[in-house]
Each structure stands twice: as structure tokens, then as C-alpha cells.
Amino acid sequence: MLDRKPLRRRRTLSCGIVVVLDSRELLLCHVTGQRQWDLPKGGIQSGETPCDAALRETHEETGLSLTPAALLDLGRHDYTASKDLHLFASLSERVDPRALECTSLFVDRRSGRSRPEMDGFGWFAFDRIGALCAPPLARLLGRAIDLERVVVELVAGRERLAA
């Protein structure tokens, strides 16, 4: 008798950046037409590294231009049944959310018009993640990633560079 293992579907990979302040807040983007807020993140393109994809997606979805040297690699995590999420973190100065702009567009099924993927931005305390984000992201940021530790590591790294 053949021992057949169930076929596992290939998981897609999204990459993004958790942009944090030393005041224990993070940047979230409001998803156009939805109630939830999200991180700047998206799919990896052929030939890109996870870091390249995270930087590109963050720039497209917020206008922020970050550098690889400013990133802390948080690794690849199970996100949904069919998707993994590779996250990085970056310590930022407070940017006025009204100055941010999403240039990544999608075609709205109802209107047929192109709309930005993200239509709002804000800085939110870590304890608001569960109320604002979709459950898979809230679970990931609440359990698998210790955002308090991330801020401590990023601040220590900034201080080492300044010394």
C-alpha cells in the first residue's frame, strides 16, 4: 500500500515593516473599504528579497523611504492558512499621518475606479492592536512578536550608532 501524504498547498509570502516609536506606538494603515487597520505589507515579487519587498511595500503604501540598515529582522511567521508573513521593524520619529500617502492602487469592484489600497494612517498604542487589526495580525503582533522587546532592541541599536 502506498503511503500518501496530503499535498500541502504552497504558501504565499507577504513582507512588511512594523514602524514603531519609542513611545510604544506603531504606524497602522487603514485598509480602503474595510473596517480594519493593517501594517504596510504586501507580496514579494520575483527576484526580491524579503527585505526588498518590505521596503518597497512600505514606500508604496505610506510614502516612507526606509533603509535596510534601519531594519530589525523579525523573521518569517505563520500568518493565515495559506500565507506567511516576513516582518521587519524600524524605529521612527513621529511623522504626521496626514503627510503619508498610498500610491499602490486597486480597482474597486463596485465602482470600477482605481483607489489607493490604504486611505488613512495613524499612530496607535500597542494595546489597541486587537481592536483595530484583523485577527491574524492581532494574534501575530500580540503573541509571536514582543513589540516591547522590539522597541528596546531598536532604541539600543540607535544609541550604539550614536555613540
Report each predicted region and the residues it spans.
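Conserved N-terminal beta-strand and adjoining loop/helix that marks the start
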Residues: M1-L26, S46
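Short, P/G- and charge-enriched loop/turn segments at secondary-structure junctions
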Residues: M1-R8, L74, V107-G112
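Catalytic phosphate/metal-binding cores of nucleic-acid and nucleotide-processing enzymes, i.e., regions
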Residues: L7-R9, L13, V31, A54, ...
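Short hydrophobic/aromatic beta-strand or adjacent loop that forms the aromatic wall/cage
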Residues: T12-G16, K83-L87, M118
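Conserved hydrophobic "DFG−1" position in protein kinase catalytic cores
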Residues: V19-V20, L28, S90, W123
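Conserved Nudix-box catalytic region and its N-terminal flanking loop in Nudix hydrolases
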Residues: L21-S65, A163
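A short coil-to-beta-strand element that immediately follows conserved catalytic motifs
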Residues: S65-G75
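Active-site-adjacent beta-strand/loop module that shapes the phosphate/pyrophosphate-binding cleft
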Residues: H77-G112, G122-D127, L140-V151
